[in-house]
UniProtKB/Swiss-Prot annotation:
<keyword id="KW-0460">Magnesium</keyword>
<dbReference type="InterPro" id="IPR045121">
    <property type="entry name" value="CoAse"/>
</dbReference>
<keyword id="KW-0464">Manganese</keyword>
<comment type="similarity">
    <text>Belongs to the Nudix hydrolase family. PCD1 subfamily.</text>
</comment>
<feature type="binding site">
    <location>
        <position position="87"/>
    </location>
    <ligand>
        <name>Mg(2+)</name>
    </ligand>
</feature>
<feature type="binding site">
    <location>
        <position position="83"/>
    </location>
    <ligand>
        <name>Mg(2+)</name>
    </ligand>
</feature>
<dbReference type="GO" id="GO:0009132">
    <property type="term" value="P:nucleoside diphosphate metabolic process"/>
</dbReference>
<dbReference type="InterPro" id="IPR000059">
    <property type="entry name" value="NUDIX_hydrolase_NudL_CS"/>
</dbReference>
<dbReference type="GO" id="GO:0010945">
    <property type="term" value="F:coenzyme A diphosphatase activity"/>
</dbReference>
<keyword id="KW-0479">Metal-binding</keyword>
<dbReference type="InterPro" id="IPR000086">
    <property type="entry name" value="NUDIX_hydrolase_dom"/>
</dbReference>
<dbReference type="GO" id="GO:0000287">
    <property type="term" value="F:magnesium ion binding"/>
</dbReference>
<feature type="domain" description="Nudix hydrolase">
    <location>
        <begin position="29"/>
        <end position="160"/>
    </location>
</feature>
<dbReference type="InterPro" id="IPR023735">
    <property type="entry name" value="Nudix_NudL"/>
</dbReference>
<keyword id="KW-0378">Hydrolase</keyword>
<feature type="short sequence motif" description="Nudix box">
    <location>
        <begin position="67"/>
        <end position="89"/>
    </location>
</feature>
<dbReference type="InterPro" id="IPR015797">
    <property type="entry name" value="NUDIX_hydrolase-like_dom_sf"/>
</dbReference>
Amino acid sequence: MEYRSLTLDYFLSRFQLLRPQINRETLNHRQAAVLIPIVRRPQPGLLLTQRSIHLRKHAGQVAFPGGAVDDTDASVIAAALREAEEEVAIPPSAVEVIGVLPPVDSVTGYQVTPVVGIIPPDLPYRASEDEVSAVFEMPLAQALHLGRYHPLDIYRRGDSHRVWLSWYEQYFVWGMTAGIIRELALQIGVKP
């Protein structure tokens, strides 16, 4: 695939053709969800946020909108949509959910389900000042280019954990966010 020519139609057909295998076992993890917002354009974008530097956890990191599943959420999809509205003012009704990726275990004890959704290009994003310091869009073709990610093995509590690192403009994309983007690339058939 030529990355400069990634169209939304190609992305959608590949995503729907190669449905991810989901293991529904939760292993008593707390549940969380993130929205992977794909901006509907001829050359689609990927919406990301930079977390506020004042947050207790993951301060200043690039992330997808998302958070813990609340008792009021009907599902992980509902949680992802609620969090996206709270963090960057994306109305749930504006999101066309096309599926989910396999859940990812976080270092903070959550099982995080990435929810993939298509959003209109003209939404007026409004960052929640308490949680988000920046909202930016990365071309999806660049985000899914696996060559931009570099591995780093981190040792924590006697275990090795591989994390992925990348830069986009002034933003350092790494950890779970980079791992989810890589998983999305692999899901649509991008070869490492």
